[in-house]
């Protein structure tokens, strides 16, 4: 078998002729022919019983970068959900002409070239302080070129729906427009006590200290589902030089990775690992079914190096659905300046479930046990579809995610590539944003962000969806 290398485009005529000649010389009794991967799989299928079978999850280790552009990822997921609804309702024929036009425009969106190659077009070893980055984006053509390319690729999901007939095009565009709904206003006074929401099926207590759900009780069973820091706890994580050294030693020693996967020039700055969580919140009830929360933002003293670009606002909204065991959570991150320093934003969900095999992750329609990852695979970060579910003999917990898709089981697992077992009593942690990976992914981001989640409780015996 002869395949082409990564990012090299189609074979040239000369390379095709050379491939045929060399293969015929090496295998004179064989028939040499071009084939698709599907045709190759069909040829191998009769031999499948004699081949090794791997049933464990591999765990893609190259998915960090997809968290670098929340707007693009959210839009892509929204268009795909809309397409699924059209197919389910009979409004779109799967594999029909309209569907293929739409998918043809969408296919480039998840592909890993989200812009220019950073190892070639972003070799600057400066720009890690916010004022340096601002100046470079204004004055340095290479920085500006990267911005333009990331912006163009970000528009791909929105541009894709333009190939649809007018009714569907307008519907999809309206749904994409809703993704930019701004954060609500919340009174500036700090909440003196926890706030509570309840319906006939569940009761939620929202902490005045963290803004997270500190208690979530299924009123049908009396079970308390929130553990530790609760459900919906926000965190900011900054990474330092030592984090990247450890990651390089563990993951990839190749020389090219310093520029391609790393942060060239970061060692020139006094950057240290940093973890910050809000220490207070303002809250306000909106009717009987919703609470708006404004989280405290950090004082400058948290990072005197001026290497961190904090959001100016972090806003949460909790909404209970009437007569349902569901709680919707929306998180807005507003006014965050662009920052080249490696960083990540998280929303954590610590669930009171003690069955170590109770968790499953929805990955391309399959229910994956996060413990069942092959040795050397990526067990600490997964890309999910609907989200994560937990089941035991006494009930169940669903965490559905509409916009964010990267989940780290058992703790913050970015830049971690060991084979230590997971401790899922430490919950599921949704990565809202990170700029850790290089290649062609955005290295900074200054758009407002919005993330939607749904928590659903189940009585015992209810199946996963």
Language model feature labels by segment:
Residues 1-157, 287-465:
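Catalytic-domain carbohydrate-binding cleft regions of carbohydrate-active enzymes
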